[in-house]
């Protein structure tokens, strides 16, 4: 056996598979990880584990697809939940921190999923994120933000929770329930499940021109001040078939409208950083990828954009398929959704007017009788 063959055999013995943990925290988080395994049961594997963590035993027991279930409780709680109190959720997480610390030993990357605005998800998620950051485990959060219909108190709790989370996590992705038509929150679950799947596959599936895990770490772990938010988004795959002379013009037109309807709070436009993965059908001989890149950069519209490109040549897609992971920075002090804030003010004004009208009606009725 020559030296090269010996080195090759040693290389085959190296175990460097990423260990990834997906933690659904609180009621909404439990629902999402359970839905992930319902729609994509093969996502869970030897190195990719899903967990449901809750202070509500009844809700936790109801989840059937996720097998790793963890109850956080203390002598005052006894598995009855956090009562919508983030401080209680944080306290329960602190009482569980030793177990969580042991549980996450050996992980390289963790995704924390939660609904913000109530107790366990809002309070516990920043606590767990801080533990992971202390252990130097790359961690990101995917969070839902309540609609106005859920009440201003709930929204205020969510906003305060995001400020705490922002100091702990490497980055987070925000889904606004306000954008769910008619309050159908199952839509949020479906969108977030897709985001989790796309994020995991972007990181774990090797490419011929590869995006390695250190690229991913560098993407998420950016220095920030407490005044900065660091948000990310992962797109749905954008697929296109080049089958005519004007295909590049059609590609530009369709990509311009890509993400026009987005349920997340931020799109790829104006992104500071991008990880772009392109699957290209190897049967395409004449494909000017430089033109495609130019179209993508035009949509992102940031001349200081940092980009890392991954490419794979496959036979199982129409022509080209693109995934984009993008990062943004926004001041925490600004409203998360300016349009939503304006709508909130209009609705509050309307409520005040209705209240005043109601008082006039009552006064008028009293005068009659």
UniProtKB/Swiss-Prot annotation:
Q: Extract the Gene3D superfamilies matched here.
A: Tubulin/FtsZ, GTPase domain
Short name of one Pfam family: Tubulin
* Bilayer-crossing regions: none
User: Which molecular function GO terms apply here?
Assistant: GTP binding; GTPase activity
Taking the first listed entry, what is the main subcellular location of this protein, grouped into a coarse class? cytoplasm
GO-annotated biological processes: cell division; division septum assembly; FtsZ-dependent cytokinesis; protein polymerization
Check the record and name the InterPro entries matching this protein. Cell_div_FtsZ (IPR000158), Cell_div_FtsZ_CS (IPR020805), FtsZ/CetZ (IPR045061), Tubulin/FtsZ_GTPase_sf (IPR036525), Tubulin_FtsZ_GTPase (IPR003008)
Q: Which UniProt keywords apply?
A: Cell cycle, Cell division, Cytoplasm, GTP-binding, Nucleotide-binding, Septation
Q: Where in the cell is it found?
A: Cytoplasm
Q: Which GO terms describe its cellular component?
A: cell division site; cytoplasm
Q: Which domain of life is it from?
A: Bacteria
Enumerate the residues binding GTP. Answer: 27-31, 119-121, 150, 189
Protein function: Essential cell division protein that forms a contractile ring structure (Z ring) at the future cell division site. The regulation of the ring assembly controls the timing and the location of cell division. One of the functions of the FtsZ ring is to recruit other cell division proteins to the septum to produce a new cell wall between the dividing cells. Binds GTP and shows GTPase activity.
- Provide the family line: Belongs to the FtsZ family.
Oligomeric state and interaction partners are given as: Homodimer. Polymerizes to form a dynamic ring structure in a strictly GTP-dependent manner. Interacts directly with several other division proteins.
Indicate what this protein is called per its UniProt record: Cell division protein FtsZ
Annotated source species: Mycoplasma genitalium (strain ATCC 33530 / DSM 19775 / NCTC 10195 / G37) (Mycoplasmoides genitalium)
């Amino acid at each position: 056996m020559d030296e090269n063959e010996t080195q090759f055999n040693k290389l085959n013995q190296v175990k460097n598979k990423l260990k990834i943990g997906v933690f659904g925290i609180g009621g909404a988080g439990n629902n999402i990880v359970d839905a992930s395994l319902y729609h994509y049961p093969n996502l869970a594997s030897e190195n990719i584990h899903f967990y449901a963590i809750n202070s509500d035993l009844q809700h936790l027991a109801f989840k059937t697809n996720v097998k790793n279930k963890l109850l956080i409780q203390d002598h005052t709680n006894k598995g009855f939940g956090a009562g919508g109190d983030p401080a209680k959720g944080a306290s329960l997480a602190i009482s569980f921190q030793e177990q969580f610390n042991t549980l996450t030993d050996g992980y390289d990357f963790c995704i924390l999923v939660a609904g913000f605005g109530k107790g366990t998800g809002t309070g516990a998620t920043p606590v767990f994120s801080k533990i992971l950051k202390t252990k130097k485990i790359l961690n990101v959060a995917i969070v839902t933000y309540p609609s106005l219909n859920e009440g201003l108190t709930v929204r205020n709790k969510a906003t305060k929770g995001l400020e705490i989370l922002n100091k702990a996590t490497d980055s987070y992705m925000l889904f606004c329930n306000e954008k769910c038509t008619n309050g159908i929150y199952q839509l949020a679950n479906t969108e977030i499940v897709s985001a989790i799947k796309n994020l995991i596959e972007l990181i774990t599936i090797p490419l011929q021109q590869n995006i390695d895990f250190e690229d991913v770490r560098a993407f998420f772990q950016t220095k920030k001040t407490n005044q900065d938010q660091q948000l990310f988004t992962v797109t749905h795959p954008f697929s296109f078939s080049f089958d005519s002379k004007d295909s590049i013009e059609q590609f530009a037109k369709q990509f311009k409208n890509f993400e026009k309807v987005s349920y997340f709070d931020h799109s790829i436009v104006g992104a500071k950083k991008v990880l772009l993965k392109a699957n290209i059908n190897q049967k395409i001989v004449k494909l000017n990828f430089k033109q495609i890149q130019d179209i993508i950069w035009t949509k992102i519209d940031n001349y200081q954009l940092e980009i890392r490109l991954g490419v794979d040549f496959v036979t199982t897609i129409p022509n080209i398929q693109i995934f984009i992971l993008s990062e943004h920075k926004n001041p925490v002090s600004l409203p998360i959704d300016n349009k939503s804030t304006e709508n909130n003010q209009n609705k509050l004004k309307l409520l005040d007017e209705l209240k005043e009208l109601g008082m006039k009606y009552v006064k008028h009725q009293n005068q009659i009788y």
